[in-house]
């Protein structure tokens, strides 16, 4: 009986540590989305309210995603859980884009589906990597931080240097699509190579 109570206490402590990561997970996810949202909401549309609304929605979405991530990592082997998170985040994100925002292939054929899927996958995958305590992921975390800094600087320079109009619009749309695709590839390749 004492063994059972000790086991339950240990499980409770471990579970508590997991849930203490939730605020960091949400914060990193919101920051991951922030540059892309800034580009679309503010630099293209000039709509600060949309940026704020997106950040609030993303925080709520990430809270739910954290629960799903936690469950997947308890049920599946680590790499399988990670890949399941990537796929589910991309698919769920496309669901948000299609049914809540109106960026479906039939409603907005010009919307970049692959870029949107990568954006939503990164929204979950980047914080998943950041909150992971595995020391083998430290180099990947540094690469993500450097990439984020370079990407943000490039976006700000583009906004400052390019004239308003079509060039600036195209720059922001394509840097979001390509930027989040590259970030997703960096995350998936780095995680699968380093995590055990």
Predicted feature descriptions by range:
Residues 1-196:
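Aromatic-rich, lipid-facing transmembrane alpha helices and their immediate juxtamembrane interface loops
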């Amino acid at each position: 009986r004492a063994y059972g109570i000790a086991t339950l206490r240990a499980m409770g402590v471990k579970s508590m540590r997991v849930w203490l990561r939730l605020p960091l997970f949400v914060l990193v996810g919101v920051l991951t989305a922030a540059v892309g949202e800034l580009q679309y909401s503010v630099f293209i549309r000039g709509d600060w309210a949309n940026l704020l609304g997106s950040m609030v929605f993303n925080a709520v979405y990430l809270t739910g995603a954290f629960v799903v991530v936690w469950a997947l990592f308890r049920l599946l082997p680590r790499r399988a859980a990670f890949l399941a998170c990537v796929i589910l985040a991309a698919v769920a994100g496309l669901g948000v884009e299609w049914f809540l925002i109106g960026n479906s292939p039939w409603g907005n054929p010009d919307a970049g589906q692959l870029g949107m899927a990568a954006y939503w996958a990164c929204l979950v995958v980047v914080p998943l990597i950041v909150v992971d305590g595995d020391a083998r992921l430290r180099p990947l975390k540094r690469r993500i931080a450097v990439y984020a800094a370079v990407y943000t600087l490039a976006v700000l320079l583009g906004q400052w240097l390019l004239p308003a109009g079509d060039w600036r619009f195209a720059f922001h749309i394509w840097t979001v699509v390509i930027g989040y695709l590259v970030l997703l590839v960096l995350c998936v390749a780095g995680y699968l190579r380093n995590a055990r």
